[in-house]
Amino acid sequence: MQTSLLKPKIIAVESLGESHAKVVMEPFERGYGHTLGNALRRVLLSSMVGYAPTEVTIAGVVHEYSTLDGVQEDVVNLLLNLKGVVFKLHNRDEVTVTLRKEGEGVVTAGDIELAHDCEVINPDHVIAHLSKGGKLDVQIKVEKGRGYVPGNVRRYGEESAKIIGRIVLDASFSPVRRVSYAVESARVEQRTDLDKLVMNIETNGVISPEEAIRQSARILVDQLSVFAALEGTEAAAEAPSRAPQIDPILLRPVDDLELTVRSANCLKAENIYYIGDLIQRTENELLKTPNLGRKSLNEIKEVLASRGLTLGMKLENWPPAGLDK
């Protein structure tokens, strides 16, 4: 009698738009479609890392219930429009950007003056409408975070940092806009009692739907690994000197990072075959690699950061015994 559980063998991704996709996984044992679908959905909505405006300072405005001469929108609507701007930061956790515009016309997210390591995903997003003689001068603080953080948590949690005219925003950091899932019937040979999991994911463009589901799965695996390593107190006391376990992600080849062909070839030319090899190198060491420039380095750092890793890390007992080169 078979006792092992089925694992999905078919994973199909159907693009429904630039940041919208349907992911189909099958087959699952009966009941596992809802078990995993609900868990992934909750993680996708609550635990993904993203970027959001958190503080705004507008010239001539003391509080959010003000109005500005020459600006059609009041400050409340202006703030709502600013919260709709989708930012993406590279290799930093926060940045302050400036929006200055004068004269009649439409103000869009593309008018924001950006630092070199910050980009706007939706530059056509409308922020305000200026009439003749109108002027807008705004400082926007953008931060990296997770989930949803109400503005009053920071407003009252930093008494010493109060600034007149600074408006603290509720921040929705999650790059995932909508997630839904459905469980359908699947069949393998004569078995017809299996599950097919269909997930519908839409993001704001900071990450792709495929990357969102990959990250959510890693979060679940990381949380559940604590239970997989569960030991009794007696067993733990008997083996206090056990060698530290190596994170399985470090044993994966650098090809799994899905770098550009140029970056991947440069790493292999330096005998960097595994993620564990890569994270032990410093930025200066990588920049000395032939044909690997600053753009490739930033790509590598960004991909590692999405997995909670950085360059220059120290590993004990590396490489592990039996690791093929």
From Swiss-Prot:
SUPFAM superfamilies named among the record's database cross-references: C-terminal domain of RNA polymerase alpha subunit, Insert subdomain of RNA polymerase alpha subunit, RBP11-like subunits of RNA polymerase
Catalytic reaction annotation: RNA(n) + a ribonucleoside 5'-triphosphate = RNA(n+1) + diphosphate
CDD domains: RNAP_alpha_NTD
UniProt entry keywords in alphabetical sequence: DNA-directed RNA polymerase, Nucleotidyltransferase, Transcription, Transferase
Region Alpha C-terminal domain (alpha-CTD): start-end pairs: 246-325
Subunit-level organization: Homodimer. The RNAP catalytic core consists of 2 alpha, 1 beta, 1 beta' and 1 omega subunit. When a sigma factor is associated with the core the holoenzyme is formed, which can initiate transcription.
Domain remarks: The N-terminal domain is essential for RNAP assembly and basal transcription, whereas the C-terminal domain is involved in interaction with transcriptional regulators and with upstream promoter elements.
UniProt record similarity statement: Belongs to the RNA polymerase alpha chain family.
Task of the protein: DNA-dependent RNA polymerase catalyzes the transcription of DNA into RNA using the four ribonucleoside triphosphates as substrates.
UniProt protein name: DNA-directed RNA polymerase subunit alpha
Native source organism of the sequence: Paraburkholderia phymatum (strain DSM 17167 / CIP 108236 / LMG 21445 / STM815)
Highest classification ranks of the organism: Bacteria, Pseudomonadati, Pseudomonadota, Betaproteobacteria, Burkholderiales
